[in-house]
Amino acid sequence: MGASTTARLGPARVRSERRSCAAERHRLVDLYRYERRLARLGLEPVAGVDEAGRGACAGPLVVAAVILGSDRRNRIAGLADSKQLTPAARESIYNEIISRALAWSVVVIPSSEVDELGVHAANITGMRRAVAGLAVRPAYVLTDGFSIAGLNAPGLAVCKGDEAVACIAAASVVAKVTRDRLMVELHEKFPMYEFATHKGYVTAGHRAALARHGPCPEHRRSFVTVRRAGGRMELRITELADSDDSPGFASGPAEAVPGPAGSAGAASAAARPAAAGPAGRLVDQNRAADLRDNGDVSRPAELLEIP
């Protein structure tokens, strides 16, 4: 900023804007640190994967995979977890991602398939499809929160990865914007539910519309809110838990998760719970198993620990 800018805005305002610009530069440097670290290990390109619509009771589940690259000249200003952005900012950053990413892929899983597979299995299936759909094959895959086997590339889960990793944040934006646009289209078809407002998530207005009109074909019958509105109340084990109940683990075979032919360990890896941890730290419980499941035992997971 030159002397004319200082005179126009005042010294205090100029200092504040300089601090803000410096903070944003540091934030972006930190956001891209996983891609830089993996590039130094010879693991490029890196794909990030995330979904939108997991907790909605209507509409599709949308999964995106994005490869950004580690070149600092190609960093996307303002990139962040989609939940931290305004709708206008998401649209702007979405356009930047689509035009500047090395590769991107989107998978839309309709509500009927979510009901058939279950939300978690549908999410895993969508992530596999999204990575397989990339025009550039990734050397490494980073996922948000839990690991995915059967990706034909080594990968790791990152706690709160959509906040800590650039390519996962980009995937979250692409998935969210894509799904929001689809929900606006569904609003035109089913205006009585106001899908354009709540995007299929449970709100007081959505509950009232369900009570008044019943569910439409885009509602997920596997969700208790929809089953109540439709007059069907099959009780599930998960609905017996009280608010103070803690998670437990069952013995026996893991639930089968659809995946590519020949992808060993898909069910067991999908059943592994993700460990809690601070944002931007790799999930300790899954790290070594991820490398083993994805066929890369030559690179210890500890190489990717980033302070």
Swiss-Prot record:
Cofactor: Mn(2+); Mg(2+)
Keyword Repeat: no
Keywords (A to Z) from UniProt: Cytoplasm, Endonuclease, Hydrolase, Manganese, Metal-binding, Nuclease
Annotated Low complexity bias: 250-280
Keyword Nuclease found: yes
Any single GO CC term annotated in Swiss-Prot or TrEMBL for this entry: ribonuclease H2 complex
PROSITE patterns: RNASE_H_2
Domain of life: Bacteria
Record NCBIfam families: PRK00015.1-3, PRK00015.2-2
PANTHER family: RIBONUCLEASE H2 SUBUNIT A, RIBONUCLEASE HII
Record's protein name: Ribonuclease HII
Gene name of this polypeptide: rnhB
